[in-house]
């Protein structure tokens, strides 16, 4: 995660190491400052980003996740990650993602986005197995990533065929897609 913040006056003269220590002292324990980059005045990590990447984790199975319980969606059932990944490939490229965003947020706004990469794979972290949905794109609409995940879960659980993703994309209507995955 990258953030940008303005630095003024005497702070500009501080070394990067000193600034990192100062910021670390001011932040909560669950935030870790790892690196500092000096950027031109007016730079915004949000608006000047060329790409954004997200990882959404799902714990599929009857056992709740132990370590990831507060940042993983526990889905009590089986999911076919290979089918989910196959369907996900239809979303790579430039498309109108209106079906995958909160309907009210799409009114009168452009909904075309470019997804550079979208993969679904089984992973293991700290001894627990998860399904990771990794997506990289130029920008995302409101709830777009979570709605993509919810739609892929419908396919992974066998309730919809892989080809359904094409219908959802073509519909350009939020009602056509699966439910929005929970915030994690």
Give residue ranges: language-model regions.
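Structured-RNA-binding interfaces characteristic of tRNA pseudouridine synthases
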Residues: 1-184
